[in-house]
Amino acid sequence: MIGHNRGPSMAPGETWRRHCWTQARTALLPVLPIEVLRTRVRRAADLGLDYRTYASVRAQTGHDVVAFLFSSNALRVTALQLRMAGAAAVKLAAVRAERIGLPVGRIPADAMAALNPELDRAVAAPALWAGFAVARQRLREVLGHVPGDRVILVGDQPLEAEWCAAGRLAG
């Protein structure tokens, strides 16, 4: 025996089964026309994402990304420092999708929006200690008519990760 998994199978027909499996997997993956691929690469760049991330979100949801939710923790905005750092502001300004700030805790939403013009708007985030149903309702209010699977959350704290499930967000 070779290795922990007893080595390659010696059963008759192994290479044929491997060939069939490879062909079936290849047939499942669609071949995108080059122009569609170029368009998606450009869209990923417009969103500030690498293509692999954009493609995985698009494959998971079947939709394009139309908005980002940024928690104040991810933007390093605090009650004492309401303006985000220069590098983050430049990167955020280049994103071609709706950019919504979610100030956490005692950070006023109107002040966060006013001092960070790169954000399209800022709306108070769900309380970190709020239950799942409350967080879901709050995120639905924030998103309005935009379906959750077209929105990406950029968070920094473990409790913020639960907002993805609560709001049925793309990631």
Predicted segments — roles?
Residues M1-G7:
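Membrane topogenic helices and adjacent juxtamembrane segments
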Residues R18, D50, A55-N116:
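Long, charge-patterned amphipathic interaction tracts in eukaryotic proteins
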Residues L115-E118, D156-P158:
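C-terminal structured domains
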